């Protein structure tokens, strides 16, 4: 009789998830060895209990999932492993600790952080080195970077560039009054400084530098129409051993270039705009052999 009760009890336990088989005392009835079928049913109950803890506790799966999620969010913070000196790489624990005890927003932030970290550690995805860093945005570019590396003035003296730039401005003002039939001459803001820096570079290997230079300034108003408007020695007390020919070009990209010449003469539109492009040619007055 006890065997049948245990069999029914095991069936109920397997259906509703009770994982502990209670002893059903029976007065006056000796306990007998369990039947092999009963042992299989007990093992099946234990396996089900181990696989599905929700059924054992009597709670639905959603409740246990909520508890597991709460327990995951209340875990203690995993200490960040210090990065290896000089490696510049972040450890896996440090990269993912925000996901362990972060909110929903923190989870997405940490996810993107881990994605970026993984792409940084594997830029080429196993196919060689990754691409070089992208250049700075236009908002971060400097004035020198707009014209390229050749116009970077870090390799020349700032005071020498300033002095030579002032000489160029003085000569251009004088040339406007004497040789250019116009009311105004507009120059790009950094044109004279870039010209001065290039003159210093081209004079770097000369015995006396730019002080032994005679500079000729020419103006090109039309293609194949070049005229000389100024010339001067950088240092009047130094003998010139080489010459530099500077050619400035008229910038005709403005709307005033479309006006007829007689209208320019009648209005204040008679303005010459100098292009930011120029040419500089060197002529040595001595033999280098």
From Swiss-Prot:
Induction: By homeobox transcription factors. PANTHER family: DNA-DAMAGE-INDUCIBLE TRANSCRIPT 4 PROTEIN DDIT4 (PTHR12478), PROTEIN CHARYBDE-RELATED (PTHR12478:SF16). It is found in: Cytoplasm. InterPro entries: RTP801-like, RTP801-like_C_sf. This is Protein charybde. It comes from Drosophila pseudoobscura pseudoobscura. Belongs to the DDIT4 family. Pfam families: RTP801_C. The gene is chrb. Inhibits cell growth by regulating the Tor pathway upstream of the Tsc1-Tsc2 complex and downstream of Akt1. Acts as a cell death activator during head development. Its main location: cytoplasm. One of its GO terms (biological process) is negative regulation of signal transduction. Gene3D superfamilies: RTP801-like (3.90.470.40). One of its GO terms (cellular component) is cytoplasm. Residues 119-142 are annotated as: Disordered.
């Amino acid at each position: 009789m006890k065997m049948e009760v245990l069999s029914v009890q095991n069936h109920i336990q397997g259906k509703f998830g009770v994982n502990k088989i209670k002893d059903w005392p029976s007065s006056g009835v000796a306990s007998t060895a369990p039947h092999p079928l009963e042992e299989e049913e007990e093992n099946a109950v234990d396996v089900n209990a181990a696989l599905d803890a929700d059924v054992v506790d009597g709670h639905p799966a959603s409740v246990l999932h909520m508890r597991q999620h709460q327990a995951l969010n209340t875990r203690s913070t995993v200490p960040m492993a210090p990065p290896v000196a000089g490696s510049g790489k972040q450890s896996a624990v440090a990269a993912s600790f925000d996901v362990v005890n972060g909110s929903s927003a923190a989870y997405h932030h940490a996810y993107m952080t881990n994605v970026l970290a993984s792409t940084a550690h594997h830029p080429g995805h196993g196919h060689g080195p990754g691409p070089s860093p992208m250049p700075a945005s236009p908002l971060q570019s400097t004035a020198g970077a707009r014209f390229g590396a050749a116009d970077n003035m870090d390799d020349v003296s700032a005071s020498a560039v300033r002095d030579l730039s002032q000489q160029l401005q003085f000569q251009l003002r004088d040339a406007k009054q004497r040789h250019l039939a116009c009311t105004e001459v507009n120059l790009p803001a950094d044109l004279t400084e870039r010209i001065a820096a290039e003159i210093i570079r081209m004079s770097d290997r000369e015995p006396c530098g730019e002080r032994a230079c005679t500079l000729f300034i020419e103006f090109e108003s039309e293609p194949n129409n070049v005229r000389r408007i100024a010339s001067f020695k950088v240092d009047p007390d130094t003998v010139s051993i080489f010459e530099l020919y500077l050619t400035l070009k008229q910038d005709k990209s403005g709307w005033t270039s479309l006006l007829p010449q007689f209208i320019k003469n009648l209005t204040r539109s008679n303005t010459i705009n100098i292009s930011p492009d120029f040419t500089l040619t060197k002529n040595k007055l001595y033999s280098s052999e």
